[in-house]
């Protein structure tokens, strides 16, 4: 199934023709990389398909309902969050369910309450939902990703604003990986990674069950993760 279709895309930048009739599509499960010389417009393609820029001609169509995570090189967030607060935002609806479940268990702590069994039954149903959504492995999942990208687990309680720019970029990348949207759009994801963490990311993306489109100057990295190569002339 096609997730994204780009057809006959034309775009001029500062009176210079950048694209003249580019067409491609990204299908479900494809691991695609976008390659081309410096200045060929790879990042501009991302700005166009994420609607930061508008093409002069042509069409860009996302299949209705498809979601994507976009990691660009200028990602900004409220850096007053701690690392764990920032990453747990991804699962806010599940943590809200857990809070409600605990409130029900507290209400159901008195066997003499006429609603005792009602509270416990409702709490049990919520717990079943949390189990189905793998809620109880979230903290382990977060640890695996941040450590894989080179962030020690003890940094989870640190605020983003005291981390280095490279460490923040790793946390932003971790968020994209954990969100598990239909499509990952990654622009230079290895910029701040040491060799062992580039290796970890390559293995993670090799096994990624959904689609992605990646830009990188790291050719060995691209060759490890790609099953589709899109060339910008």
What are these regions (language model features)?
Residues 1-233:
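ABC ATP-binding cassette signature C-motif
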């Amino acid at each position: 199934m096609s997730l994204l279709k780009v057809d006959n895309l034309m775009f001029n930048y500062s009176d210079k023709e950048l694209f003249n009739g580019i067409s491609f599509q990204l299908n479900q499960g494809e691991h695609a990389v976008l390659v081309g010389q410096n200045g060929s417009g790879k990042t501009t393609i991302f700005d166009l398909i994420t609607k930061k820029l508008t093409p002069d001609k042509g069409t860009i169509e996302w299949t209705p309902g498809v979601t994507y995570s976009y990691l660009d090189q200028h990602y900004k967030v409220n850096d007053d969050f701690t690392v764990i607060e920032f990453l747990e935002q991804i699962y806010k609806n599940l943590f809200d369910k857990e809070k409600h479940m605990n409130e029900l268990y507290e209400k159901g702590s008195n066997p003499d309450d006429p609603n005792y069994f009602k509270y416990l039954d409702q709490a049990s149903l919520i717990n079943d939902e949390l189990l189905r959504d793998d809620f109880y492995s979230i903290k382990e999942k977060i640890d695996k990703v941040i450590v894989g990208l080179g962030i020690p687990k003890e940094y989870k309680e640190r605020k983003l604003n005291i981390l280095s720019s490279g460490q923040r970029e790793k946390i932003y990348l971790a968020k994209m990986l954990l969100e598990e949207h239909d499509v990952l759009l990654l622009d230079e994801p290895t910029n701040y990674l040491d060799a062992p963490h580039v290796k970890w990311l390559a293995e993670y993306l090799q096994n990624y069950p959904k689609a992605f489109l990646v830009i990188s100057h790291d050719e060995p990295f691209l060759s490890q993760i790609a099953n589709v190569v899109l060339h910008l002339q």
